[in-house]
Amino acid sequence: MANMRKSHPLLKIINHSFIDLPTPSSISSWWNFGSLLGICLLIQISTGLFLSMHYTSDTMTAFSSVTHICRDVNYGWLIRYLHANGASMFFICLFLHVGRGLYYGSYAFMETWNVGVILMFTVMATAFMGYVLPWGQMSFWGATVITNLLSAIPYIGPTIVEWIWGGFSVDKATLTRFFAFHFILPFIIAALAMVHLLFLHETGSXNPSGLDSNADKIPFHPYYTIKDILGALIMISVLILLVLFSPDLLGDPDNYTPANPLNTPPHIKPEWYFLFAYAILRSIPNKLGGVVALVLSILILALLPFLHTSKQRSLIFRPITQVLYWILVADLLVLTWIGGQPVEHPFITIGQLASILYFSIILIFMPLSGLIENKIMKWY
């Protein structure tokens, strides 16, 4: 069996990726989130597949088909809430995964990092389209507001919006195509994740020190398989607790009201994982400027390899940049809070200041602190 594992064309690939993969001996639990994201994707695809068997993508029956899933289908409520809260777990793991990459300088592997940025955009697009499907008030108005942003594109904007809608407003055609895209995108995400892994295994993983670890590597199995299983058990336990005790904790009560184009909810807001980007969008009084800032809030990650000025890779020995990093984390939490607040004083000002700080830290302060730390190293 050992020989077959190393000689069989298909098993050989699996062996080199998950069994005999040389892995740095010092990587911490912060490296668990890649495997957790894979598990989240599997949970989402499997629960989504069962939901799609009972869901109908028609404006007249979409809301009642979701109600039917929860009330009449065996364990339909469980599948539905696993899917909804699984998305939240997905984004928690995604943000922690990106945060770890930022802290330990994983963006130095440019190919892996850029595929990761594309993956993040794809996951966000998938989650947005999934939120539209239950056809509640927040689904409808969220879809209307976000798709309308494309009308800010000069000259071709309004045409693109009508093309996406399949008419002159968000309606049956929009819901049907969003369902089609929401179904296919997770498989594209799975393919991109394989490309992400392919590029990662070309270079090997980094480690907390940011130094070369070729002299000190251990096989992935059993050491890191056990570690990943522990991480998976913790994550699944948290997900099950969330689903069984407070399944609507992260949702919006407005989405339990069927979509009504004649009645606008008092506060239109997306799911919690988009609130930071939504706050950045709202903080700019110009429509096109807001859309550009919204896209840049994620696309800025692709610039990180070019903004790296330090002679060290990781932040572990860089106290000034460490302080900036944690200010950035706090700033993102403030933006998330602001995104859920109404557009009124003082929230508008706080949102604008937090948005300026977000871009300033990444584009100005972090590269400057890298240069300052290089100078300090020369003195000692």
UniProtKB/Swiss-Prot annotation:
Coiled coil: none annotated. Pfam families: Cytochrom_B_C, Cytochrome_B. Belongs to the cytochrome b family. A ubiquinone binds at residue 201. Heme 1 (or BL or b562) is low-potential and absorbs at about 562 nm, and heme 2 (or BH or b566) is high-potential and absorbs at about 566 nm. This is Cytochrome b. The cytochrome bc1 complex contains 11 subunits: 3 respiratory subunits (MT-CYB, CYC1 and UQCRFS1), 2 core proteins (UQCRC1 and UQCRC2) and 6 low-molecular weight proteins (UQCRH/QCR6, UQCRB/QCR7, UQCRQ/QCR8, UQCR10/QCR9, UQCR11/QCR10 and a cleavage product of UQCRFS1). This cytochrome bc1 complex then forms a dimer.
